[in-house]
UniProtKB/Swiss-Prot annotation:
Phosphorylated by AURKA. GO terms for molecular function: protein kinase binding. Keywords: Cell cycle, Cell division, Mitosis, Phosphoprotein. This is Protein aurora borealis. Residues 1-27 are annotated as: Disordered. It comes from the Eukaryota. Pfam families: BORA_N (PF15280). It comes from Homo sapiens. Required for the activation of AURKA at the onset of mitosis. The lineage of its organism: Eukaryota, Metazoa, Chordata, Craniata, Vertebrata.
Length: 559
């Protein structure tokens, strides 16, 4: 019986010695890579036409019709039975079926052409949905979104029933106009706006134009940061009328009243100059002699850098001269803020010629027009330097600064004025330099500087009494800390110090050596070189006086 069964199981091919028929696409270990991706490119399924047709060949279907072959069904049955009994291996077949099932359930049958270009497609979508910012106004930013849709067909293995409600499930996640609700008002919550407009306390700065325009503090604060800004934004301010606050792009946070401008992060070699036109009208601050009549200087080219507390803005720069900048610092001594001592409110005269000082970095002076930086050790008097660059536009005005002096008397303002006019020598003994006699002019305006208690008011160390006789020249002077300004035009400057017209230097205090000289070139420009060696001052109450006389009154309006 065993031999009979064994003979039934053995099926020999029709021709003895013939190689058994095998599937050329299969191998004994093909189950190990059946689940892997076999298609190298989706272009396999594309039908390509050759440019030159080859030789004519009959197709298989045509040959079957032309030359039919008679196949015995018994031969087919025998060969099928042989193939089924010759290679029976349950383990290998199970592995193959498992690999085939894994291939059709987990992997993509045909790779989609969009699969290999995900990064490129994302970049295209990002560029098509970029925001266009209105460059005319950096504050009123308008968000414009170009919503573009691109359809692409790809293969999916997801099967859904006919009555499946896809909108209820994916409706919350699919929003075609999800960026349409972003308005300029909602931009305040973005991180970029917080970096630009938040001050050190974490709140929106008062310099934003969203503040009430009727309040004097917001209006003056807006004017303070108008004239100088360190622009770190790619948005360009085209019109100053549409840019009410260019200081909002300042790299340093703006504090409340006691301002300290930390400009340590400045990397730009040449700060961007501010616009030269301002529609805001400014008002001269009140002093003991100007309380009775208030002047409002209407000038499109000047501003008063004074806030409600009377603090003069240091970040004011003359926009007329760029390469040959005005005086940026009156002394090579650096700035330092002390809490103790008496603070002073002084004025500085700005003349359009270059100040060359030794011991100070020129690039630092160009980048930082006025700032509060630590300086070498000084006395507790709290001496500070502050530069004021204020400009206005008047024509045909003859300005004469008759005296600028420092005294240490404790009397009232009127007594000090009379004492200074009567006894000049006594004032010089008290560390006062008066180099010219007062010029009697019919219409004159006198300002007297008195010490104040505000700890943030600075004082300059270059207070030598120099008289400038200017006729049709471009000159900016600030007789008050509130900075009312009167410039002229042309460039003919005569400097009369009482001794000569070329060398105008004197000893200001006991240990101050100041050497100043003026050189006139063919282009009628002046260069002043100031060398300050030491500065020592007693801790006494000091009153600075400045008399300013005008040959013809400048135009002003009383509110």
């Amino acid at each position: 019986m065993g031999d009979v069964k064994e003979s039934k199981m053995q099926i020999t091919p029709e021709t003895p010695g013939r190689i058994p028929v095998l599937n050329p696409f299969e191998s004994p270990s093909d189950y190990s890579n059946l689940h892997e991706q076999t298609l190298a490119s989706p272009s396999v399924f594309k039908s390509t036409k050759l440019p030159t047709p080859g030789k004519f060949r009959w197709s298989i279907d045509q040959l079957a019709v032309i030359n039919p072959v008679e196949i015995d069904p018994e031969d087919i049955h025998r060969q099928a039975l042989y193939l089924s009994h010759s290679r029976i291996d349950k383990d290998v077949e199970d592995k193959r079926q498992k690999a085939i099932e894994e291939f059709f359930t987990k992997d993509v049958i045909v790779p989609s052409p969009w699969t290999d270009h995900e990064g490129k497609q994302l970049s295209q979508c990002h560029s098509s949905k970029c925001t266009n910012i209105n460059s005319d106004s950096p504050v009123g930013k308008k968000l414009t979104i170009h919503s573009e849709k691109s359809d692409a067909a790809c293969q999916t293995l997801l099967s859904l029933p006919v009555d499946f409600n896809l909108e209820n499930i994916l409706g919350d996640y699919f929003r075609a106009d999800e960026f349409a609700d972003q308005s300029p008002g909602n931009l305040s919550s973005s991180s970029l706006r917080r970096k630009l407009f938040l001050d050190g306390n974490g709140s929106i700065s008062d310099s934003l134009p969203s503040a009430s325009p009727g309040s004097p503090h917001s209006g003056v604060q807006t004017s303070l940061e108008m004239f100088y800004s360190i622009d770190l934004s790619p948005v360009k301010c085209r019109s100053p009328l549409q840019t009410p606050s260019s200081g909002q792009f300042s790299s340093s946070p703006i504090q409340a009243s006691a301002k300290k401008y930390s400009l340590g992060s400045i990397t730009s070699p040449s700060p961007i100059s501010s616009p030269t036109f301002s529609p805001i009208e400014f008002q001269i601050g009140e002093t003991p002699l100007s309380e009775q009549r208030k002047f409002t200087v209407h000038s499109p080219d000047a501003s008063s850098g004074t806030n409600s507390n009377g603090i003069t803005n240091p970040c004011i720069r003359s926009p007329y001269i760029d390469g040959c900048s005005p005086i940026k610092n009156w002394s090579p001594m650096r700035l330092q803020m002390y809490s103790g001592g008496t603070q002073y409110r002084t004025s500085v005269i700005q003349i359009p010629f270059t100040l060359e000082t030794q011991g100070e970095d020129e690039e630092d002076k160009e980048n930082i027009p006025s700032t509060d930086v630590s300086s070498p050790a000084m006395d507790a008097a709290g001496i500070h330097l502050r530069q004021f660059s204020n400009e206005a536009s008047t024509h045909g005005t003859h300005l004469v600064v008759t005296a600028m002096s420092v005294t240490q008397n404790q009397s009232s303002a009127s007594e000090k004025e009379l004492a200074l006019l009567q006894d000049v020598e006594r004032e010089k003994d008290n560390n006062t330099v008066d180099m010219v006699d007062p010029i009697e002019i019919a219409d004159e305006t006198t300002w007297i500087k008195e010490p104040v208690d505000n700890g943030s008011l600075p004082m300059t160390d270059f207070v030598s009494g120099i008289a400038f006789s200017i006729e049709n020249s471009h000159m900016c002077m600030s007789p008050l800390a509130e900075s009312s300004v009167i410039p002229c035009e042309s460039s003919n400057i005569q400097m009369d110090s009482g001794y000569n017209t070329q060398n105008c230097g004197s000893n200001i205090m006991d240990t101050v050596g100041a050497e100043s000289y003026c050189k006139e070139s063919d282009a009628q420009t002046c260069e002043v070189e100031s060398k300050s060696q030491a500065f020592n001052m007693k801790q006494d109450h000091t009153t600075q006086r400045c008399w300013m006389k005008t040959a013809s009154p400048f135009q002003c309006s009383s509110p």
